[in-house]
Amino acid sequence: MNKTNEITLSPHWEDRISNEQKLRRNDQRSVFQRDRARILHSAAFRRLQAKTQVHGPGSANDFYRTRLTHSLEVSQIGTGVVAQLKLRQPEFRALLTSTSLMESICLAHDIGHPPFGHGGEIALNYMMRDHGGFEGNGQTLRILSKLEPYTEHFGMNLARRTLLGVLKYPAFLDQVHSTERPQEVTNVRHLKSIDWHPPKGVYRDDADILNWILKPLSDVDKALFSTFRFQQDSQNTHRKTRFKSIDCSIMELADDIAYGVHDLEDAIVMGIVTRNQWQESVASKLAECGDEWFEANIETISDKLFSGLQYQRKDGIGSIVNALLTSITIKPTTFNDEAEFESELLRWNAFLSPSMSYALEVLKKFVGQFVIHNSEMQRIEYKGQQIVMEIFDALNSDPERLLPENDKREWREAKESGANAHRVIADYIAGMTDGYAQRLYNQLFVPI
């Protein structure tokens, strides 16, 4: 293994798939500063302000987070992680040179999520079951590299390392899909979401992009990078990829912290969770998580979170975020007895300490149990799921009549070339905000 103070990276990680020539007088920005600007100014990013995070836009309470504010918070946490890693482990500064790179990855990480959150994702996956499936992370890569009209054919034309950082699951959906497909339903209202959760990965339609991203890697690294975390323990279980780049590992930790802590704050403010639920399901476990700081301060943090005073609650939330963030370190991706990656971007990942990893899992499980799976939230998700499936069914019945002109042209081109025309319909729906999807549904199905 190379010494970490001798880390060097191939210049090809700053390549773009298209060697564009933009009219930008005296532009002194770095590659990753330009990537950040492209993402921030994109229509796909703006639409996140009207897409469900946990509580759908239009809720009676305007305090909650949307996909947009969540992405901004993930970016803030991600850059905070990079800053503290540079101080604690200066030998890795050559790997963590650009704050703009981490901002770009974090800002873009949710850009492919469809309207109505996971309900919309399940709906599109079901409707695309015979045409390559649908998954939010795969859609993110597709938007960044093909769909967003910053360029004619290459989406935002982001740098290779930025796309590698967004690539959470480096395998095709059909490679990780369960061997046994659930039973189809005769009525979409009878669809059980648990049966149609998509596997995590990249569409076969985007094989060219995945191959381009991984091109600088050796054949050995490519093979190791695409291995799975575990074998399927049943025919109905999707497999998961095991590895990701160091940038992606930081983004994923930032995403998990934002989900486990900031979505918790929304739930407290809106009265969805109580102090007793918190005490029984979280505080009692964090008091014994093995982290001395948490064990000593969890009671004080609990008092602040449920004090009813906004500044106290914010201080409690900030304390948890800081405790998690400062427990992250860079370690080798593989274990001592395993083959190691040749690429420095894959050889190292960011990890929480074991005790704080457990603490974060407790927080995420609490949010999942009392917020995500709250019956009111599930009814809203179910409604969105039905809206998306009904829209897809209508558009697919007569695309040349119902699709907008640009999408109609893309659909025709796909049909004529033998490409996946159903993907065009999925792309159109996935790009909708919750409100736009609701209005289109009303136009199609609500009597005048």
UniProtKB/Swiss-Prot annotation:
The keyword Hydrolase applies. CDD domains: HDc. It comes from the Bacteria. Pfam families: HD (PF01966), HD_assoc (PF13286). GO terms for biological process: dGTP catabolic process. Keywords: Hydrolase. SUPFAM superfamilies: HD-domain/PDEase-like. Residues 67-260 form the HD domain. GO terms for molecular function: dGTPase activity. The keyword Hydrolase applies. Belongs to the dGTPase family. Type 2 subfamily. This is Deoxyguanosinetriphosphate triphosphohydrolase-like protein. It comes from Aliivibrio fischeri (strain ATCC 700601 / ES114).
